[in-house]
Amino acid sequence: MAIEKCIQTVRKAMPDLSDEQAEELLAEVVDIVDTIKSNNAEQKVTDLQGAVDEAIKSRVKDSVREAAILKRNAAINYRVRLAFITKLRETPIKEVPRMLQAILAGEMGKSQYKQSIESTSRGLLSMAKAVFMQTMEKNGVPRNVGIGFLQNKKNGRYLVQEVDNPGSSRNATAKAVAEAMEAANEMLRKQANKYGADIGRILGRIVKQSHDKTKVARASAEQWSRDILPLLDKTKTFGRPMSEAAQLKFLANVHQNIVFGKRIDTVIDIDTTNLKAKDLSAPPGFTGPANMGKKLSRSRSLHFKQDGKSAWEYNQAYGNDHIGSAFTNQLLSMSDSVGAMMHLGPNPKHMLDEFYAKARDRAINEKNLDVAGQLDQAYKAKTDLLFDEVTGQGNVLPGLGQSGYYLARGSNLAKNLSSAALLGGTTIASIGDIGTAAIRSNEIGVPFFEANLSVLRGLIPEAVGGRGGRRTGEAREIADSLGVGMDALMASVQSRFLGNDALDGQGSSAVSWVMRVTGMNWMNDSLKTAVGMTLSNYIAKQSGKKFSQLETSIRTEMEAYGITPEDFKLMNGVVREVDGKKYHDISAIDDLDAQIRINGFFTGFADSAILTPGARSNVFSRGLDRGTVKSEFFNLFMHLKSFSVTYGMEILSRGFSKANEGHRTGMLVKIVLTSMVYGYLASTIKDLAKGKEPMDVSKNYGKVMFRSIMQGGGAGFYGDIIVGLLGDKPRRGEGAAEIAGGHVIGNLFRLGKVPQMLFSEDYDRAASTTYRVAKSMLPGANIFYARWALDYLLFWNMQEYINPGWARKHERRVRKETGQ
């Protein structure tokens, strides 16, 4: 009866509440009172009513704020829905399936659908990296020094000290890098809040607290809780005095949240210590008072002591022990999440499902059975895969205790070791990128020879009197504003050849090391800088024109990325002359959304010229969720093929596209001739690096041309394999499975034959095969400038020791098959 009277009192005070909401509110008030009473002795609360009033006042303030946020998010959702409905009506019915998936990832090749979550997140990420670089330089630390400092795992301790007590590390570089990290995060935080998040600023925050799910899971809840408890600031973490038993119970809940918490479409609260995630999947609406009450009982936050060592010690034991890696991953995940919110509102997956339903309804209402059939469950499944890819969830590995945990990680380790062994010659193979860059630049209007020269000049560094490389001074400022030439900060360089696969952990550091010592980081950044600045200069030279007066080729390219006449006016207003040439300083544009859109255009174009796999090619190359035998076998088969897939989808497709009607033959001729020229150059340098004589063109014209096209075109690393499969005689005992299956699968087949060799007492061949496999998985074994010396001083001697007479047989075989 007393409860009913209380409910009636609540209803009288707030007549708009239902009985259920009144009961929830009453339960919350009772919980507040009980909590204060239970801690009365410790808190020395003499005025219980005053304490209750204060707690309720704080609760009401939180509720009002949440209601305001929900109202704002509802308005954002309305705007997003309206924009989609308008676009759906304007899009021809046959184009609807393409248009819908292009919201997630723009189409490759010649297409009008390029603006997407992916292009937006790339633009955001490039802007965040530019903020980081420029803030470091303003603080007196050159970017190459700062990046090197960040990439050194041991320097994480100094960064933690700077966060806890600025200046305490007594390391000027650490101080500058920490401030730059905070500035980059702050830019992304503001953009996230603009589009539906509610992330508070914390001064000094450089990276969210990380938790290695596997490490935490391996420790019992009790062990983890007792290990972390001495490291915590108990006042900030628990909010009120608690007994040790209560603290351990609280931490046990946190342990469960970390180990079993389901990864969903989220924007992570990037408070350094906050575990809370804002659910982007739930539909908008007021959550009611009980939801906030439940939030009070959740595992909310862990605050470490600001002593310069507690957070560091926790990361070494249970978190990401590489602060630099955690920071770059955070920039990437935040850019992905904000990009998703900008296109789909605060609840991206919910909104995407709604868009899919509306598109299918239109097809059904118009009785278009063909389009309705295309929008089937298989289409929906692929769309969901694309969504996972562009929101950073596409390569999530199974957790400890889940099926496929060891299989997926073993697969990653094998691929990374293989990559670290093979990619030592990437810098030479990437000479072919000059050709693709020239083709793309020429396609939008840059004269063909000028396009080739501008990219070639980009490889002549300023240090030797050129105007290329990553650039410095004003030229570098322009490149930063365009969002190009900064991939080396992250794993973006190796992702050109690995997709987004196997980039973190399981030997990935070996791949990063190879990219660095071979100069591939520098070459990639230099080429993208050259492409971006060539494009900017070409457009800036036409700044006196109206958008409608631009050549059709460049205008349609810009329109595909969502660039409007208003955006073009903004670009014309920030034209700046550097070294006698006109460029755009995009960072001078006040409209941040326009700046992101324009950055997405420049970075997208650079990624299509210096081929970088995107979400579509990654989904094609990966296909399935990780951890199953089928998915891992497919992953191994597609290992190092993502570059070739991207070439086919981005470059080769332009020679067959209906959108290129009337220009397809000319495009194919340019692709073939350019591939042949730069492929011949790459294969010749590769032969010299191996200690071989260049192939005699007059005696092997057909083979040289075929080999050159394979090397300069999209075959990339697999140019050697295709040449081996079609142009050369395979090794004794090897078939198509070993050659075409890829490096890792080929090695598995080779090792699988060793027991048979031993059984047949062919010991020399068994030893030689085992040695060959081991060498092919040795990181750094193929570094181009050391290859000749390593072969003659080490590898050939080892092979000769295992198989006497091998060197002479090998030399005869190579000369017979290749004439070299």
Walk through the language-model features, giving the residues of each.
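N-terminal leader/propeptide segments of preproteins
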Residues: 243-344, 556-559, 566-567
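Low-complexity, small/polar and acidic-rich linker and loop segments
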Residues: 2-187, 201-203, 208, 213-215
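Hydrophobic alpha-helical segments
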Residues: 757-820
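Short linear interaction motifs
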Residues: 166-169, 184, 199, 268-275, ...
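Hydrophobic, often aromatic-rich secondary-structure segments at membrane interfaces
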Residues: 305-428, 432-705, 709
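Small-residue (glycine/alanine-rich) low-complexity segments and short Gly/Pro motifs
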Residues: 656-775
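Short linear, low-complexity motifs centered on an aromatic residue
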Residues: 195-210, 445-459, 654-662, 760-769
